[in-house]
UniProtKB/Swiss-Prot annotation:
Domain called tr-type G: residue spans: 6-188
EC number from the UniProt entry: 3.6.5.n1
Positions that bind GTP: 18-23, 135-138
GO molecular function: GTP binding; GTPase activity; ribosome binding; translation elongation factor activity
Family membership noted in the UniProt record: Belongs to the TRAFAC class translation factor GTPase superfamily. Classic translation factor GTPase family. LepA subfamily.
InterPro entries membership: EF-4, EFG_II, EFG_III/V, EFG_V-like, EFTu-like_2, G_TR_CS, LepA_C_sf, LepA_CTD
Protein name: Elongation factor 4
Transmembrane segments: none
Length: 603
């Protein structure tokens, strides 16, 4: 191993939402002198306005610090940030693969959460050295001894010499830097071998094209070289390489063990896939680095402009977002009810919400979104298999042999007093109980096998509301299972509204249909004629509500008078309403669509 590499440390920070990851990162950067005090009020690594607002890290932003350690040497520390949310598990696994060690940051007042667990196990699989850091010790309710014991019991790593810090107050930061130098091993690699570099993120720059964030494993990369991507075989010429001092800082070359960026006038982020290996086109390595997989969208929904004229703007906005987010997929789609729009695929629910919010915020668009759906496998009687991501494309029941739906294994951590409520919730959502273990007297880890379909609506919200926000939840896809599913159609005034169709489990169809028609009745304004709202499976109507007509009092001018006279006027009014109903069209407001997405919250 070269002399140079002994002074490099690559590490990431693993923490649950709100345990103080971004603040700790800020303090480390400040301590190594890369930021003036003036810049430290904001969370440097969280670029998107949305990230700061929600307090979550979505886009990773690496940073390089130089630290003069107590042994008198200068060390190069590369911090690779990781998003802490379940939707971005693959991204996390790639940034973990780029490191040799991890700081496990746990809130001294809260202890370990389910998502932290998932990421720590992933770090252990990649043989990372884990340094436990117990943060927020300045708070009165902090209980570091208890948290140490929990880290040992739950994760099984020694927490005797866990570091006690308060990122907010700047306590213990020096100790963290020393621990990074002394406890995390230097990178392995050989700069004389052919180039191998792992892409762990990328973003789009208007002038330089798609820029890949890489960890160089073997070899050297410098401007003018021709590089090749393993997964696509495409070749590009490197125009610039550099480091991050939070901002891009060009250097002459990147050598093995270092973390930096490569710009090669790549037009599309799709060509710089996360987890892919870059090698020298003229002297390629034999095999790529392990662990690359294509990112597959799990959740789909239709996004339509509320105003039809915004279609082009929506298309442009999605294309711009896609430049920075290769996991977002979309294709044009039309709906009889909503006009032209797009069918979009996302990694998960949070990803979907973030994309929608960014479209509305950054591009000032007014959007209508349909209920989210997952990919079903439909086995037809003629032997064909369909991947169905849109309920409207479901073939007629006579052609279907059976349908399979995606199943996930969910890990839920809850305080003991809420176990009953959560088990009930999971059973409601067709969960199959796999087991439970007590982490300590007060907390339980539950494992359930559940259909993804049941999680994507509002499972997370229901979980939080039943446990007063104390539960944490993580899931991974397990595969497909046969299930008794049907397509539920909604008819308004006798016409099918395709945007409201959804796929549901047969046992729950009636209950769901009842709720939907009641909800729609509340949200569709009254017209001059009555509007039937029906829910149907195939040709069978299973639920109905009627929005009453607005009517004029035609009897106002008959004082006393003959009953037949009144009847005649009422009959005449009825005739008119009937005629009107045949030609009238019903306006369905955006609130009606939104109310259906929020159905189960109100129990």
């Amino acid at each position: 191993m070269s002399e140079r590499m002994q002074y490099i440390r690559n590490f990431c920070i693993i923490a649950h939402i709100d345990h103080g990851k971004s603040t700790l990162a800020d303090r480390l950067i400040e301590k190594t002198g890369f930021l003036s005090e003036r810049e430290t009020d904001k969370q440097i690594l969280d670029n998107l306005e949305l990230e700061r607002e929600r307090g979550i890290t979505i886009k990773l932003k690496p940073v390089r610090m130089i630290y003069k350690a107590k042994d008198g040497n200068e060390y190069e520390l590369n911090l690779i940030d990781t998003p802490g949310h379940v939707d971005f598990t693959y991204e996390v696994s790639r940034s973990i693969a780029a490191c040799e060690g991890a700081l496990l940051v746990v809130d001294a007042t809260q202890g370990i959460e389910a998502q932290t667990l998932a990421n720590v196990y992933m770090a252990l699989e990649h043989d990372l050295e884990i340094v436990p850091v117990i943060n927020k010790i300045d708070l009165p309710s902090a209980n570091p001894e208890h948290v140490k014991k929990e880290i040992e019991d739950v994760i099984g790593i020694d927490a005797e010499d866990a570091l006690l810090t308060s990122a907010k107050e700047g306590i213990g930061i020096e100790e963290v830097l020393e621990a990074i130098v002394n406890r995390i091993p230097p990178p392995k690699g050989d700069e004389n071998k052919p180039l191998k570099a792992l892409i762990f993120d990328s973003f789009y720059d208007n002038y330089k094209g798609a820029i890949s964030f890489v960890r160089v494993v073997d070899g050297i990369v410098k401007p003018g070289m021709r590089i090749k991507m393993f997964s696509t075989g495409k070749v590009f010429e490197v125009t610039e390489v550099g480091m991050f001092r939070p901002n891009l800082y060009p250097v002459e070359e990147l050598k093995s063990g270092e973390v930096g960026y490569i710009a090669a006038s790549i037009k599309n982020v799709k060509d710089t896939r996360v987890g892919d290996t870059i090698t020298d086109a003229d002297n390629p390595a034999d095999s790529p680095l392990p662990g690359y997989k294509e990112v597959v969208p799990m959740v789909f929904c239709g996004i339509y402009p509320a105003d039809g004229q915004d279609y082009e703007n929506l298309k442009e906005a999605l294309e711009k977002l896609q430049l920075n987010d290769a996991s977002l997929v979309f294709e044009p789609d039309t709906s009889a009810a909503l006009g032209f729009g797009f069918r979009c695929g996302f990694l998960g629910l949070l990803h979907m919400e973030i994309v929608q919010e960014r479209l509305e915020r950054e591009y000032n668009l007014n959007l209508v979104t349909t209920a989210p759906s997952v990919i079903y496998k439909v086995y037809k009687t003629n032997g064909e298999v369909l991947d169905l991501d849109n309920p409207t494309k479901m073939p007629p029941p006579t052609q279907i042999d059976h349908i399979e739906e995606p199943i996930v294994e969910a890990t839920i951590m809850v305080p003991t007093e809420y176990v009953g409520a959560i088990m009930e919730l999971c059973q409601d959502r067709r969960g199959v109980y796999l087991g439970m273990e007590y982490l300590e007297q007060t907390r339980v880890l539950l494992k359930y096998e559940m259909p993804l379909n049941e999680i994507i609506y509002d499972f997370f919200d229901a979980l939080k509301s039943r446990t007063r926000g104390y539960a944490s939840f993580d899931y991974e896809l397990k595969g497909y299972k046969e299930s008794n599913l049907v397509k539920l159609d909604i008819l308004i005034n006798g016409e099918l509204v395709d945007a409201l169709s959804m796929i549901v489990h047969k046992d729950k169809a009636y209950e769901k249909a009842r709720k939907i028609v009641e909800k729609l009745k509340e949200n569709i304004p009254r017209h001059l004629f009555e509007i039937p709202i029906q829910a149907a499976i195939g040709s069978k109507i299973i639920a109905r509500e009627t929005v009453k007509a607005l009517r004029k009092n035609v009897l106002a001018k008959c004082y006393g008078g003959d009953v037949t006279r009144k009847k005649k006027l009422l009959e005449k009014q009825k005739e008119g309403k009937k005629r009107m109903r045949q030609v009238g069209s019903v306006e369905i407001p955006q609130e009606a669509f939104m109310s259906i997405l929020k159905l189960d919250d109100e129990k």
